[in-house]
Amino acid sequence: DPSRPVIDLFAAETGAVLAVAVWLLRDELRAVSPLIEKQVVRCLKERILEPYLKEHFWWMGDGVSPMNNWTIWCTQNVLMTAALWEEDEEISRAILQKAAKSADFFLAEYGDDGCCDEGPQYYRHAGLCLFNTIEIMNGMTDHSFSSLYREPKICNIAAYLSNVHACGPYYINFSDCAAVAGLCSAREYLFGKRTEQKEL
């Protein structure tokens, strides 16, 4: 139903990809036509930011229902879109508050040991999306969330990949993950840096 946009995993991710692409290429796009940016931003507001505030999707959490990586993965992507393209401070604040609540629900599901119950591959859509969420919230609030990096649970979430690393490209495998989880990126390094864990 085009009159009631649904934010699911890939709607949120597509929104974030478009938000970042247009932000990075805005000068080049404006040289072609100023209408490109306007159309993309209009769609981002209609399909992502407005329904995010107006609706409650299951992955946002309610403090009772169990959450999974959708919660923080979608939250990260909606926040990225808002951080880049929402100019109204009141709307931006409302999105931030709702996102922070979802992040709390997500964290409540994590054990104190920081283990990702979906395995090392999904950690990138769980623990690392939490890292991105904190970074975006810090960017939107002049680093109001920086103290989170000193919380033991957050530090343990950051250390998860190094704790389950077996050797070379192999990780201790469980759930529906492969033993070869793929190459690490800058996010693992930066999460380690923020939590002061040199082994990362």
Give residue ranges: language-model regions:
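Carbohydrate-active enzyme catalytic cores, enriched for enzymes
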Residues: 127-200
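Active-site lining segments of carbohydrate-active enzymes
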Residues: 2-121
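Amphipathic alpha-helical protein-interaction segments enriched in hydrophobic
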Residues: 120-128
